[in-house]
Amino acid sequence: MKQFEDRFSELQADMISICMEYVEDRAGKVYVYASCEEDMISSSFFYLINNKYVECHKVNDALENGDEGYDVSTERQFMVLNIINDDAKKIKVLCKEYERDMPTEMKLIYDVKSGNFKAEYKYDLVHTNDDIKTSDDFADEWFEEIKKINL
């Protein structure tokens, strides 16, 4: 039992770690969205930097005077997304190996200052059952929700 929990936690920590690397450890909070439904895996990530909620491609918008800019190249963004997606695949394999249900949706929040980590999971199909919305739409909605409630 402990081994499953440890490996699951390590994979989530890796998702947060690569997102922190993307902003050179200069963020207040990190948010990771991962979706794994049927044979499709997708992800998204965003930040709270200088009290501004920003998507990964807009992190430079949160900089204050004198702050060094971030490398937000498409290549770096895809590198992070690929690692998050690979970790989600590993979680899927882990869940199968231990005969556990695989979350269809994972919302991870890491507060850098306090070290607090919060995870929210869904196990029912989310975007697969929606005729219009994709996993990206649900990730965008979560970003807007986080901004609205100041989480």
Indicate where each model-derived feature is located.
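N-terminal "first-domain core" detector
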Residues: 1-61
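Intrinsic-disorder-associated interaction segments
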Residues: 1-9, 73, 77, 84, ...
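Amphipathic protein-protein interaction modules
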Residues: 75-127
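Short, surface-exposed linear segments at secondary-structure transitions and domain or protein termini
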Residues: 53-58, 66-70, 128-133
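A broadly used, surface-exposed interaction patch
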Residues: 58-85
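Acidic, proline/glycine-rich low-complexity IDRs
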Residues: 109-151
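Generic detector of well-ordered alpha-helical segments enriched in charged/polar residues
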Residues: 5, 9-20, 81, 85, ...
